[in-house]
């Protein structure tokens, strides 16, 4: 008896990434939760895709083993094998680590916001959603275009392979079936019905393999986009949070005293406090040019100042008021806002940690495979002697492989930049005008955010633009070794 997994009303990351999740399901990946249908039939559907992919990948490996004598042929077949290794690796990796993917998606499955910051939360969420959808659309469009170009270029140039002539000890061309991929088949794929079947099967293999690999990568990058926009949200509300604390605080200390010199011989005068010296007429128009500079749009309403023990008409103080001069309701308002910020930041930290645990090993395998593939491609690029099919093929492989690596690194680097700037945002806000609790909060934020968040490849490297530069450096080094061995 099969069970039916009916979709329900999802929120958070699951709802935002539903187009990606559905595409993963329909393409055959083992992403079975969050969508309707029979669980058994979905497993059968994915298993059939896996069998087809493994079968064709095995044929590619056999072809590489059978044509290992000629160096250029071996190099080209190795590049093709490494290219499709990404696809097989991520397909199987997702199948084995389904629970980790589901856990990461479910980390952000509830709506948790604060009424004072709901507008900012919604704005940055909409920005993240737009970026994730745009990334999904562009990557899928590029994938289909790449598969189409791969199929089209098959009909140009000579369909041959190079073999070693043992009599003359030289390489000679041998005609092979005109197929998108050089592959071994246990049947005669040179003409007739078997040729049509082989050609259609390879088109399916090229398209779906690239879709599988890129869908997994898009989900990973979408997680990073969401985390970065949440950090933007937290940085954006830091200043109004401090201004809220200052506006609710009935005791307004002289902020200039915070910067007083401790030297006993100092002759400097403190800045006059207009609250204690109302007669001072100081023109501030040259310093603050707009209400936004004062943060007026974030000030709490005046009714918040009238909370008190005498029907709200007093000065806001009650017996046993806290040292900051806040009433209980005012103190609750400030504390709830501070608590919201802390809990949201902890939520982002948990999300980033889950992303690294879920996709770190896949990143490690991808980078190892890409480094070897890019090295061989650089070697193959030295064989280009004109504008021909070979040149387009090598450049296409090279551009696609570099784009995949850069795709990871640019989003990983943005996560590092956004998380490292949280401490700067906390220090830059007007914390010295806030309550004592707010000042303590800023101090804790600065301490906790000294180390930037990052994604690691199974603890071996950090995903950033530095990694991209390191990969290019390693490729150049290995390329020089290959040239010398030539």
Swiss-Prot record:
Cytoplasmic topological segments: 1-47, 97-135, 213-351, 412-462
Expression tissues: Expression is restricted to olfactory sensory neurons (OSNs). Coexpressed with Snmp in a lateral-distal population of OSNs. Expressed in the embryonic antennal-maxillary complex, in all 21 OSNs of the larval dorsal organ, in the pupal antennal OSNs, in all 120 adult maxillary palp neurons and in approximately 70-80% of adult antennal OSNs, where expression is highest at the dorsal-medial edge. Localized to OSN cell bodies and to the distal portion of ciliated OSN dendrites.
Entry keywords, A to Z: Behavior, Cell membrane, Glycoprotein, Membrane, Olfaction, Receptor, Sensory transduction, Transducer, Transmembrane, Transmembrane helix
Extracellular side: 69-75, 157-191, 373-390, 484-486
Protein location: Cell membrane
Source lineage: Eukaryota, Metazoa, Ecdysozoa, Arthropoda, Hexapoda
Chain's role: Odorant coreceptor which complexes with conventional odorant receptors (ORs) to form odorant-sensing units, providing sensitive and prolonged odorant signaling and calcium permeability. Orco is a universal and integral part of the functional odorant receptor, involved in the dendritic localization of other olfactory receptors. Expression of Orco alone leads to formation of rapid and transient ion channels not directly responding to odorants, but directly activated by intracellular cAMP or cGMP.
Assembly information from the UniProt record: Heterodimer with conventional odorant receptors (ORs). Complexes exist early in the endomembrane system in olfactory sensory neurons (OSNs), coupling these complexes to the conserved ciliary trafficking pathway.
One Pfam family hit: 7tm_6
Protein name (database record): Odorant receptor coreceptor
Major localization listed first in the record, in broad terms: membrane
InterPro entries from the UniProt entry: 7tm6_olfct_rcpt
Note: The atypical heteromeric and topological design of the odorant receptors appears to be an insect-specific solution for odor recognition, making the OR/Orco complex an attractive target for the development of highly selective insect repellents to disrupt olfactory-mediated host-seeking behaviors of insect disease vectors. Odor-evoked OR currents are independent of known G-protein-coupled second messenger pathways. The homomeric Orco channel is thought to be a cyclic-nucleotide-gated ion channel that depolarizes the olfactory receptor neuron.
Glycosylation sites: 169, 188
Gene for this chain: Orco
Gene Ontology annotations of biological process type: behavioral response to ethanol; detection of chemical stimulus involved in sensory perception of smell; olfactory behavior; regulation of protein localization; response to pheromone; sensory perception of smell
GO MF terms held by the record: calmodulin binding; coreceptor activity; intracellularly gated calcium channel activity; ionotropic olfactory receptor activity; odorant binding; olfactory receptor activity; protein homodimerization activity
């Amino acid at each position: 008896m099969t069970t039916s997994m009916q979709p329900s009303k999802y929120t958070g990351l699951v709802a935002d990434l539903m187009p990606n999740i559905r595409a993963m399901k329909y393409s055959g990946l083992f992403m079975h939760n969050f969508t309707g249908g029979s669980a058994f039939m979905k497993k059968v559907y994915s298993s059939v895709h896996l069998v087809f992919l493994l079968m064709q990948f095995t044929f590619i490996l056999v072809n590489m083993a059978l044509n290992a004598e000629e160096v250029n042929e071996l190099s080209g077949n190795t590049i093709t094998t490494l290219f499709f290794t990404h696809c097989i690796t991520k397909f199987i990796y997702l199948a084995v680590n389904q629970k980790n993917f589901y856990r990461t998606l479910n980390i952000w499955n509830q709506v948790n916001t604060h009424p004072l910051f709901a507008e900012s939360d919604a704005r940055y969420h909409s920005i993240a959603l737009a970026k994730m959808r745009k990334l999904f659309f562009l990557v899928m469009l590029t994938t289909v275009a790449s598969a189409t170009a791969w199929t089209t270029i098959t009909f140009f140039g000579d369909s041959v392979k190079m073999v070693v002539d043992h009599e003359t000890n030289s390489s000679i061309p041998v005609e092979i079936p005109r197929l998108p991929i050089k592959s071994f088949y246990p049947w005669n794929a040179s003409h007739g019905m078997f040729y049509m079947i082989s050609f259609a099967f390879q088109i399916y293999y090229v398209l779906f393999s690239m879709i599988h690999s890129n869908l997994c990568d898009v989900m990973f990058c979408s997680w990073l986009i969401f985390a970065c926009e949440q950090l933007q949200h937290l940085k954006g509300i830091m200043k109004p949070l401090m201004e809220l604390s200052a506006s609710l605080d009935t005791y307004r200390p002289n902020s200039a005293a915070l910067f007083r010199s401790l030297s006993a011989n100092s002759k400097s005068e403190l800045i006059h406090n207009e609250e204690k010296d109302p007669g001072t007429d100081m023109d501030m128009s040259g310093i603050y040019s707009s209400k936004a500079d004062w943060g007026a749009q974030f000030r709490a309403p005046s009714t918040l100042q009238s909370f008190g023990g005498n029907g709200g008409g007093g000065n806001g103080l009650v017996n046993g008021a806290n040292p900051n001069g806040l009433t209980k309701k005012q103190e609750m308002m400030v504390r709830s806002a501070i608590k919201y910020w802390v809990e949201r930041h902890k939520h982002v930290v948990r999300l980033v940690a889950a992303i690294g645990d879920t996709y770190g090993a896949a990143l490690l395998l991808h980078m190892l495979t890409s480094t070897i593939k890019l090295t061989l491609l650089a070697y193959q690029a030295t064989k280009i002697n004109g504008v021909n099919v070979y040149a387009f093929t090598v450049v296409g492989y090279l551009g696609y492989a570099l784009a995949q690596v850069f795709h990871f690194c640019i989003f990983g680097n943005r996560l590092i930049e956004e998380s490292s700037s949280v401490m700067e945002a906390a220090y830059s806000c007007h914390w010295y005008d806030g309550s004592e609790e707010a000042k303590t909060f800023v101090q804790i934020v600065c301490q906790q955010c000294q180390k930037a968040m990052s994604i690691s490849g199974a603890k071996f490297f950090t995903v950033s633009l530095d990694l991209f530069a390191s990969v290019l450096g390693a490729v150049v080094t290995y390329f020089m070794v290959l040239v010398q061995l030539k």
